C-alpha cells in the first residue's frame, strides 16, 4: 500500500469536480493525520503506479481488469463488486455475501484467500497484510493466507504496512508494529502517520514530533507554530509555518521556503520541483525559487518525470511539461496517469474513459464507464473484539469510486 494515496475518480460536472478538489486541498492542510486517508494526503501522482486497473467496460455491468501495458482485458466481467488495484499480481474483491477474497491476476476463478474476512488488505511491497474475520480481532496473514500473528484484543486499529511498519492503536495510544506483529515502537503517541522516507509524524503532549524507524525523536515542534501538509517524499516534507510553507529535510531542519507558496496548497518535491498555489491558481516552482510555470491552472498534478496534468479555466484537462509547454491538448473532462507505462493516460470525454498515449491516440478498442483508481478497499483496520470501542465504517466506505462523485454532481 502506498502512503496517503487517495485518488478520486473525477467524473461528471467539472465545476463540482473542482469544488471537491478544493475541499481535498483544504483537508490536506489539516493538522496531523490519525492514519493514512485522514488529513495528511499525498499531493502528487507519482505513487501507486500499476500495470493493472479494474474497469467496467461500456455496455457491461460487471468489473474486469485492464492490462494498461498490452491493452488486454483480463478477468472479463468476472466480478459484481469493484476489485482493488492489483499489487504484486494480487487483488482483493468483496463477494455478494459481503466478505473479502483475494485472487491472482492470472486466475480469477479460484480465490487464494477465502474465509469470512470482513476486512482484508492488499500486500503492496510486503509479504504480509492485515485481515479481520467476522467477530474476531485483527490478524496478520502472509500470501498463503497463513496466520502470522493474531494481535491482542487491546489493539483496536491499525494502518496498512508501509516501509515494513504499521501504526497501531492500543488503549487509545499509537505505536508501530513490524511485519511479525511485534511492537517495535511502543504505543505512547496521541496520533501517528505511517512511515514515508523513513520518517513519521506523531503527536504527543501537544507537540508534533518527527521520529525515525527506531522511534527516536528527530525533531520536536510546537503544534501552535507548525502544521504538517504532507508526508516525507524524496527527502523533504512540506509544513506550514504561519502563512508560509517551509520544507524540512530528514533531520527536521528548514531546508528552503518561498514567499510565493501559500500554506493551503499542495506541495511535494519531484525532480527538484513542486506544484504550488498562489491566488487560487496552481503553478510550478523549483526548489531554488524559480517560477517555472506561473500559477494559472485550477489544478496541477505531478504525473511522471517532466509531465503534469493540468486543468484550465474551461474545466478541461491536458498535460504540460516542466516548461509549461502543452504535451496533451486541453480537451478532456478528466485525465489520470496511473499506469507503469509512463505515456499512458486515462482520459474522459463525455461519459466514457479511454486509454490514450501522449499523442492522444487510443491504445485499446474498448472504452470504460468506471475505473478504480482508489487503491485498496481497506487502509485502516478495525478490531471486532477490541476492548476500546471504536467507530467502524461500513464496507462501502473503504474506497471511493466514480459513482461517489457522480452522485454529488447529480445532486447539484
Regions found by a protein language model. Give the residues of each.
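Residue-level detector of conserved, function-critical positions
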Residues: 44-394, 412
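Glycine-centered signal
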Residues: 1, 11, 24, 402-406
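Long, low-complexity, intrinsically disordered segments
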Residues: 395-412
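Bacterial N-terminal signal peptides that target proteins for export
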Residues: 19-30
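Bacterial N-terminal signal peptides
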Residues: 30-39
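Intrinsically disordered low-complexity regions specifically enriched for long asparagine
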Residues: 11-12, 16, 38, 44-49, ...
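Hydrophobic, helix-prone linear segments
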Residues: 9, 28, 43-44, 99
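Short, Lys/Arg-enriched N-terminal segments with co-localized hydrophobic residues
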Residues: 1-20
Amino acid at each position: 500500500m502506498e502512503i496517503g494515496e487517495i485518488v478520486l475518480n473525477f467524473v461528471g460536472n467539472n465545476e463540482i469536480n473542482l469544488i471537491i478538489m478544493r475541499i481535498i486541498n483544504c483537508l490536506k492542510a489539516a493538522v496531523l493525520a490519525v492514519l493514512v486517508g485522514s488529513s495528511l494526503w499525498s499531493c502528487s501522482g507519482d505513487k501507486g503506479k500499476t500495470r493493472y486497473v479494474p474497469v467496467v467496460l461500456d455496455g457491461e455491468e460487471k468489473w474486469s481488469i485492464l492490462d494498461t501495458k498490452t491493452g488486454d482485458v483480463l478477468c472479463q466481467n468476472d466480478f459484481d463488486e469493484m476489485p482493488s488495484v492489483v499489487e504484486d499480481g494480487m487483488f482483493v474483491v468483496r463477494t455478494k455475501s459481503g466478505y473479502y477474497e483475494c485472487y491472482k491476476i492470472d486466475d480469477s476463478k479460484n480465490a487464494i484467500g477465502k474465509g469470512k474476512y470482513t476486512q482484508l488488505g492488499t500486500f503492496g511491497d510486503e509479504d504480509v497484510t492485515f485481515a479481520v474475520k467476522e467477530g474476531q480481532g485483527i490478524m496478520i496473514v502472509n500470501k498463503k493466507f497463513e496466520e502470522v500473528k493474531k494481535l491482542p484484543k487491546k489493539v483496536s486499529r491499525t494502518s496498512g504496512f508501509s516501509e515494513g511498519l504499521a501504526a497501531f492503536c492500543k488503549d487509545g495510544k499509537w505505536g508501530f508494529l513490524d511485519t511479525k506483529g511485534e511492537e517495535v515502537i511502543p504505543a505512547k503517541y496521541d496520533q501517528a502517520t505511517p512511515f514515508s522516507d523513513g520518517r513519521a509524524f506523531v503527536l504527543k503532549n501537544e507537540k508534533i514530533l518527527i521520529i525515525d524507524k527506531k522511534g527516536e525523536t528527530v525533531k520536536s515542534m510546537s503544534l501552535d507554530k507548525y502544521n504538517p501538509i504532507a508526508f516525507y517524499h524524496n527527502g523533504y516534507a512540506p509544513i506550514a509555518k504561519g502563512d508560509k510553507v517551509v520544507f524540512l529535510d530528514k533531520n527536521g531542519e528548514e531546508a528552503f521556503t518561498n514567499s510565493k507558496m501559500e500554506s493551503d496548497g499542495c506541495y511535494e518535491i519531484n525532480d527538484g520541483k513542486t506544484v504550488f498555489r498562489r491566488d487560487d491558481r496552481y503553478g510550478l516552482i523549483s526548489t531554488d525559487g524559480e517560477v517555472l510555470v506561473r500559477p494559472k491552472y485550477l489544478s496541477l498534478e505531478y504525473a511522471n518525470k517532466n509531465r503534469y496534468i493540468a486543468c484550465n479555466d474551461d474545466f478541461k484537462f491536458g498535460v504540460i511539461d516542466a516548461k509549461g509547454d502543452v504535451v496533451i491538448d486541453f480537451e478532456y473532462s478528466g485525465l489520470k496517469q496511473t499506469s507503469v507505462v509512463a505515456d499512458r493516460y486515462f482520459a474522459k470525454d463525455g461519459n466514457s474513459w479511454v486509454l490514450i498515449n501522449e499523442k492522444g491516440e487510443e491504445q485499446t478498442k474498448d472504452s470504460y464507464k468506471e475505473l478504480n483508481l482508489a487503491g485498496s478497499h481497506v487502509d485502516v483496520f478495525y478490531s471486532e473484539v477490541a476492548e476500546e470501542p471504536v467507530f467502524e465504517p461500513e464496507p462501502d466506505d473503504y474506497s471511493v469510486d466514480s459513482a461517489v462523485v457522480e452522485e454529488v454532481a447529480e445532486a447539484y
